[in-house]
Every structure is written in structure tokens, then in C-alpha cells.
């Protein structure tokens, strides 16, 4: 029940929205007031949290699940391709899918890289079962690759003007001559370098100084959590190639376990999201080195349940200011993305985006679902459906820890670009109230939701603030606020919350 603050008594305390992000690591008794116990489909910006944008259908009518999105970047034209079923399709333009551009494939789980040589710009793709292909901006071709079974190439990276390859089910990597997209592949077995055995999963580059030069390194990752770092320009010349070190970290999850952020690269592992600047700088992967340390409990739960499911991927989205770890599920609707604000390091969780593959194309974010490619971070609904955003703040000891309080009213301060309907919940003493929409009929929302359409005040037109007091009737040492909104037509921000309470003896 919304009511005028003039009729209320007692103290009032304001605290910010949970801009510190999701925290599933620490005891609920010790969470900072800026952290959240739950933060689904809210993005923690520096000054507020906001409901994420929606997604739109981009290309429809693909034959099966889209398991790969591959982007060709050149100086003249960019193109995006999707692998679905046994074929690859051009999905650059929105609309119904056209005819396949590659057919008769064994699987649709590709890794890819862009490389520019004197012969042009190329997208080079491989899947570990079929012969690799490359696209030059106008046509696909199959490169001639000598001294290796080409179909065994399952991952690819560019380093020092060469293509480097991971070969399936082995600790062997291959590489081509400088500025080449085809030719004789030289092979190197790293079995004597790694002490835990296993197989190579991925290759990435890591630059200490942010540029190409003596500090530009190549990293080889095994499925057992070992990293071999090399530096140099020519693996066939011992005077121009050398092992820098071997490091032990968490086991990587999937082939798409690397994402590059500036000169750094992040590794998606069973132990969390690890930045190479920290891991390779310290030579170890202590728990607090993980960027995901603050969400370690929920992250670990996801690893235990889904680590064997295809679709784990790290993706960096500069336009949105965040990176995401995609966690797939065998059940539709249960996919999640752990989201980290690249500026503040705050985390949240996105849901209802069932993406098996992710890519940034022309600065926009896309994901591949079941028979469709979607454009993410677009619009205010999820392909016509509502965006369900739910948050729960930390439990805060208003007025200190010296005694219980009687809580009488709360006022979340929200902002949106149209009339806003939001549901509010209120919990005390670490209780976990209902998470269903249950409009109050008594004016009390101690363990339920109260739904109201708020009065508005101009706030940076066309954005308006929504401020209404909600009556509560509860006693406790601490309290947490829950917010839930279901929206299809508006942008929503949560700015702060006011809580009114009375401190008394013997309450």
C-alpha cells in the first residue's frame, strides 16, 4: 500500500541500489550494503542498477540449434556466419535464412580466427572432424594442408603472423609458415612439457606491455589445467623461440574458454574466470585471483551441474561494457550468463537468453539459439516476451547491531521512460520471502510482494523517477528489500532505497 511519508514516524535511512553486484561468496550477515543476494537480469552500473535490454530475432528458419557464430572482419565488408546442423549459413542480414554456403558437415561446433595476409583478409574455421575452410570475403575454399590430417584441426589462433592449430585428442600443436593460410603444417608435441598429461584445448596470445614485441606471448592450454607459455617468432629456430614457463590453473571448460580483454585474456575454468595478468604474474591461481571470486558459490554450482554440457563460452562485449560467461543447460529456459561490469568488476546474472554460441558483429552482440540467431542487448522485450528482473539486497542492520527495529515503510527510488509497475518485497533476519507476485491486500509486505503503479516526477526527460512509500509491519535486527519487475516496453533503473524504522527497547 503506497502512502504519504508525512504520516510516518521514526528514523529514515537511504542506501544505494546494489551497484556492488551479486555476492554469493560471503556470509549474508557480512554483505556490504551495496551488494546483492540475488541480481537477475539487472546490470550493475556505477551509479545504479538497470534492467538489461532485451533481444530480437535476427535470422530465423535455421534447421537446428545454432552451435557456432563466426564473424569475418575486413576493411571493406564484415560478414557473420552460423553453423547449424550439418551446414553453415550467411546470417549477416536480418530475416529468413538463405541457402547453406557449406554443407555435409560432421558437426557444427567450430572455432575460428581472422587473419590478414598479402593475399587478403580471411576467416579461418575448423571443427576437429571436417576439413578446415576459409572465407575471403566473397567465397569459401578448403585450404591444402600438408603433413597433417587436416580434419584433426580443432582450434586455431594467430601469433606472430602465423596460424597455430590445436590437434584433436593430443598435446600436439601445428603451425604454418609466416603469412600463410595453407601449406605444410609443422607439428610440435608438448608431451614432455606438461606433467599432467591430457590434451590441448585452446591457444591464445597474451601481451605484457599491450603491444606486439618481445613481451608478446603464446599460451597453450590443456584440459588438465596446465598452461605452457612461449615467446618468440619461429618455433623451428631455438634461438628465436623459447619456453617462458609452465603454470597450473583450473581446468578450462570447453574449447571457447578464452576471451581477450585489451592486452589481457581471461580463461573460463572450473575454478572461475581467471585473468592471465594475475595468474601468470603470480605463477599460481589462488582462489582470490579469480575475477569471479565474489560469485564463487553460484559459479561452482554451475560448474558441478553443467560443465559437461556444450555451450560454455566467454565473450567480451565492449559496447555494453561487460564480459559474459555463458552457462548452457540441457533444459530450455535454464541457460544463464554470468555478467561482469568491466569498469567496476561487479557481477550479475542474466537469464532467459538460451544461447549456445555468442559473437560480437559490427559492435553488436548476437547469440545462436534453437533455429534462430538473436540480436542481444536490443529493445525492451525478449523476442516479444517480458523481461523478468529480480533482485534482493543485502541484509542491512539499520541503526546498528545493538537491537531490533520496527520497520514501518520502504521507498525504492526507480526511474523509467514510461509508467512503471514494480513489485516490492521485504524480509527481516535473513528470511527468504516468497518470489511470486502476490499483491498485498492488507498493506503489509513483510513476507510477500506489494504491487503498485507509482506516481512520477520528471527526471532527465523522457526519463522519470518513481517514488512511493510502501507500508510494512515487521520487527527484526536487519532487513533486506526485494524488487521484481516484468517489462516489455520500458527501460528501468533502480537508483536507491529509503527505509523508515523505529528503534526501541524490548521490541
Label every PLM stretch briefly.
Residues 54-60, 98-103, 141-146, 188-194, ...:
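A short beta-strand motif characteristic of beta-propeller blades
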Residues 219-247:
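Surface-exposed extracellular loop regions of Gram-negative outer-membrane beta-barrel proteins
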Residues 81-83, 124-125, 161-166, 214-223, ...:
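Hydrophobic core segments of beta-strands in well-ordered, beta-rich domains
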Residues 92-95, 136-139, 179, 233-235, ...:
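Short loop/turn segments that connect beta-strands within beta-propeller blades
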Residues 156-213:
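Solenoidal tandem-repeat scaffolds enriched in leucines and small polar residues
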Residues 1-98, 104-123, 248-264, 270-507:
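Beta-sheet repeat architectures centered on beta-propellers
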Residues 137-160:
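Asp-box/WD-like beta-propeller blade repeats and closely related beta-sheet repeat scaffolds
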Amino acid at each position: 500500500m503506497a502512502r504519504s511519508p508525512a504520516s510516518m514516524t521514526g528514523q529514515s535511512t537511504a542506501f544505494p541500489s546494489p551497484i556492488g553486484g551479486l555476492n554469493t561468496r560471503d556470509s549474508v550477515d557480512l554483505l556490504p550494503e551495496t551488494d546483492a543476494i540475488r541480481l537477475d537480469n539487472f546490470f550493475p552500473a556505477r551509479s545504479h542498477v538497470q534492467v538489461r535490454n532485451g533481444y530480437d530475432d535476427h535470422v530465423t528458419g535455421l534447421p537446428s540449434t545454432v552451435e557456432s557464430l563466426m564473424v569475418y572482419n575486413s576493411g571493406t565488408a564484415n560478414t557473420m556466419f552460423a553453423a547449424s546442423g550439418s551446414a553453415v549459413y550467411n546470417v549477416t542480414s536480418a530475416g529468413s535464412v538463405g541457402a547453406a554456403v557449406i554443407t555435409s558437415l560432421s558437426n557444427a561446433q567450430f572455432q575460428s580466427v581472422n587473419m590478414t595476409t598479402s593475399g587478403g583478409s580471411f576467416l579461418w574455421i575448423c571443427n576437429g572432424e571436417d576439413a578446415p575452410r576459409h572465407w575471403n570475403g566473397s567465397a569459401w575454399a578448403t585450404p591444402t594442408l600438408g603433413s597433417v590430417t587436416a580434419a584433426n584441426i580443432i582450434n586455431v589462433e594467430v601469433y606472430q603472423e602465423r596460424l597455430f592449430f590445436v590437434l584433436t585428442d593430443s598435446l600436439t600443436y601445428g603451425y604454418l609458415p609466416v603469412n600463410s593460410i595453407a601449406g605444410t603444417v609443422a607439428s610440435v608435441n608438448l608431451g614432455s612439457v606438461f606433467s599432467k598429461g591430457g590434451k590441448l584445448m585452446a591457444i591464445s596470445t597474451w601481451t605484457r606491455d599491450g603491444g606486439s614485441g618481445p613481451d608478446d606471448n603464446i599460451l597453450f592450454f590443456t584440459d588438465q589445467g596446465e598452461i605452457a607459455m612461449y615467446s618468440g617468432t619461429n618455433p623451428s629456430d631455438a634461438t628465436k623461440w623459447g619456453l617462458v614457463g609452465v603454470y597450473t590453473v583450473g581446468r578450462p571448460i570447453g574449447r571457447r574458454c578464452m576471451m581477450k580483454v585489451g592486452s589481457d585474456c581471461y580463461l573460463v575454468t572450473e575454478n572461475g574466470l581467471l585473468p592471465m595478468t594475475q595468474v601468470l604474474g603470480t605463477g599460481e591461481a589462488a582462489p582470490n585471483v579469480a575475477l569471479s571470486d565474489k560469485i564463487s558459490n553460484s559459479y561452482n554450482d554451475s560448474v558441478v551441474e553443467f560443465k559437461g554440457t556444450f555451450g560454455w563460452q566467454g565473450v567480451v562485449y565492449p559496447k555494453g561494457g561487460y564480459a559474459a560467461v555463458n552457462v548452457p543447460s540441457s533444459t530450455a529456459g535454464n541457460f544463464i550468463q554470468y555478467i561482469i561490469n568491466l569498469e567496476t568488476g561487479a557481477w550479475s546474472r542474466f537469464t532467459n537468453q538460451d544461447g549456445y554460441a555468442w559473437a560480437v558483429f559490427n559492435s553488436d552482440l548476437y547469440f545462436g539459439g534453437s533455429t534462430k540467431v538473436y540480436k542481444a542487448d536490443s529493445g525492451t522485450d525478449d523476442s516479444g516476451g517480458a523481461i523478468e528482473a529480480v533482485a534482493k539486497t543485502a541484509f542491512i542492520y539499520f541503526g546498528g547491531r545493538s537491537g531490533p527495529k520496527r520497520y514501518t515503510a520502504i521507498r525504492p527510488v526507480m526511474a523509467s521512460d514510461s509508467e512503471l509497475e514494480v513489485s516490492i518485497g521485504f524480509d527481516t533476519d535473513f528470511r527468504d520471502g516468497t518470489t511470486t507476485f502476490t499483491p498485498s491486500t492488507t498493506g503489509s509486505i513483510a513476507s510477500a510482494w506489494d504491487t503498485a503503479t507509482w506516481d512520477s516526477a520528471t527526471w532527465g526527460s523522457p526519463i522519470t523517477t518513481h517514488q512511493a512509500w510502501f507500508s510494512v509491519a515487521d520487527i527484526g535486527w536487519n532487513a533486506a528489500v526485494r524488487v521484481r519487475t516484468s517489462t516489455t516496453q520500458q527501460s528501468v533503473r533502480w537508483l536507491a532505497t529509503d527505509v523508515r524504522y523505529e528503534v526501541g527497547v524490548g521490541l
